[in-house]
Amino acid sequence: GEQYVLNLIDTPGHVDFGYEVTRSLAACEGALLLVDASQGVEAQTRKLFAVCRLRRIPVLTFVNKMDLPGRPPLDLMTEVEQALTIHASAVNWPIGSGSDFAGIVTRDVNRVALFSKTAHGGATKVDVQTMALADLAASGRVSADVMGQVQHDLELLAIAGNPLSHKQFL
C-alpha cells in the first residue's frame, strides 16, 4: 500500500504554553488531540481545538490511558462531541478499560489488536496479535463481561453512531 510520513510536533497541554502551541499549529496540516480517559476534555483542549477549527485543521482525537482507571468510552465520546461541538466517528474502539483493557477493535474491518500488560503497569504493543473480532471470545483473552460490553458498544455505535466521512473530516 501507500506509505506516508507523519511529522509530529509534540506540544505541551499546559495553559502556560498556549501561545507556543498556537504558533506551532501554523505549521500543521492536521492535529492529533489526546484526551486522558480519566480527565476527559480539559479547558486547554477546548482552546486548542477552537484554534484548529478556526484554521480548518483536521483533527483526530485519541483517548489515551485506557489501561488506567477512567471513564467509560461511550461517556468520553459523548463528552468530546458536546465539549467540541462535533459529530465524532469512532474508527477504533477499546476492548475493556482500566485493569480489563486488552486492546482495540478497528471497526471498519472488525479486526482486533491485542496488547500485553507490562510488569510495571500500563500496556505495550508487544508482538502484535491480531484476529477477527468474531474470534476474540474464543481466544480466552477477555472475560465474558468485557466481550459483552464491547459487543454492546459496537452495536450501539453501528445503530446510533456517526459514520466516518472523509469529506467532513478534511
Question: Where in the sequence are the language-model features?
Answer:
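Switch I (G2) and immediately adjacent beta-strands of P-loop GTPase domains
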Residues: 1-30, 37, 44, 49-58
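A near-ubiquitous, low-amplitude feature marking generic local secondary-structure context
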Residues: 7-8, 31, 63, 91
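P-loop NTPase catalytic nucleotide-binding module
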Residues: 37-170
